[in-house]
A protein has these predicted regions:
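N-terminal loops that bind phosphate or other acidic moieties
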Residues: 1-117
């Protein structure tokens, strides 16, 4: 929602450097869900497993990701935080062999670890 994705991506790049395989897409006020879906579709590759990070589970971006998961090999992680994005970008450049499901779990766990009280 809004510029949250751009802000998270910029913050992540301050820490881990440029991330060529990461793109932020903004759902701006007045933008229709259909327009957002078309924008997301233009960057998805049906041959590449992709993670879509969204801010709120059940919000328009996560609902669109769910719909697109029927057509593309994508997984959606809702409730994104900076730690998750940093971990995802660091793992992209890693030589560590792991399945897509293991990659998703690793990112999820990294995000949870950074939530402390």
């Amino acid at each position: 929602h809004g510029e949250a994705g751009n802000a998270l991506l910029a913050s992540s790049e301050m820490i881990v450097g440029k991330t060529p395989h990461t793109t932020a897409i903004s759902l701006m006020p007045g933008m229709s869900p259909e327009a957002l879906m078309q924008q997301v579709k233009t960057i998805l590759n049906p041959d590449v497993e992709t993670i879509i990070f969204t801010d709120i589970y059940g919000g328009t971006p996560s609902n669109i990701a769910y719909l697109l998961s029927r057509e593309f090999p994508i997984r959606c992680i809702s409730g994104v935080n900076l730690a998750m994005l940093i971990e995802a970008n660091m793992l992209q450049d890693s030589d560590e062999e792991q399945s897509f499901d293991e990659y998703i779990q690793h990112i999820h766990d990294a995000g949870k670890e950074m939530i402390q009280t």
